[in-house]
């Protein structure tokens, strides 16, 4: 924005245009406190270890007081009511576990889910309809993925553990427990 100054003389009017000058000054307020990160209340601490993230983990459920049901939420915000609606509408499973594994270099942000399913026996897969009658979680093989993957009733694809375990070898003594084989170099004559 240009500033215009009008200079009037006795017979004519002249207009001068001067560009505005912008001066940047450092504020003299509390600089140390302003440099700290301040989290708003809507930022979630996913792992409850002071590691705040702006993204909510895909399965985040806020902590509730002991004995408090999802209907008796003390927080009146719409977010908590949305979470309780989500749990009621999606048949929330209390055994549902969720973890992230960032330690493995070869995996791209490995992500795993566990729902209290039993993957140990192949009989569990073939008898999934029988297991559902008994109240157990049913698993079925997906048609489009590998035969080692399973789909639970929640629609999650679970991978079977492909590691082949080596049979355990018998324990042997360590270097400190081994006894050296001494050969008797002195021959004792046998008396006849």
Swiss-Prot record:
| Basic and acidic residues composition bias: residue spans | 25-49, 86-103
What are the UniProt keywords, alphabetically? Answer: Nucleus
Question: Annotated Gene Ontology MF terms?
Answer: protein phosphatase 1 binding; protein serine/threonine phosphatase inhibitor activity
Q: Where is the composition biased (Low complexity)?
A: 8-18, 69-79
Kindly give the InterPro entries that the UniProt entry links to this protein: PPI_Ypi1
Region annotation Disordered: residue ranges?
1-53, 65-192
Q: Which GO terms describe its cellular component?
A: nucleus
Bias type Polar residues, positions: 134-148
Q: Where in the cell is it found?
A: Nucleus
Keyword DNA-binding listed? The answer is: no
In this chain, composition skew of type Basic residues spans 157-169
- PANTHER family to which the protein is assigned, alphabetical: E3 UBIQUITIN-PROTEIN LIGASE PPP1R11, E3 UBIQUITIN-PROTEIN LIGASE PPP1R11-RELATED
- What does this protein do, in the record's words? Regulator of type 1 phosphatases which maintains protein phosphatase activity under strict control.
Can you tell me which family this protein belongs to? Answer: Belongs to the YPI1 family.
Q: Give the protein's recorded name.
A: Type 1 phosphatases regulator YPI2
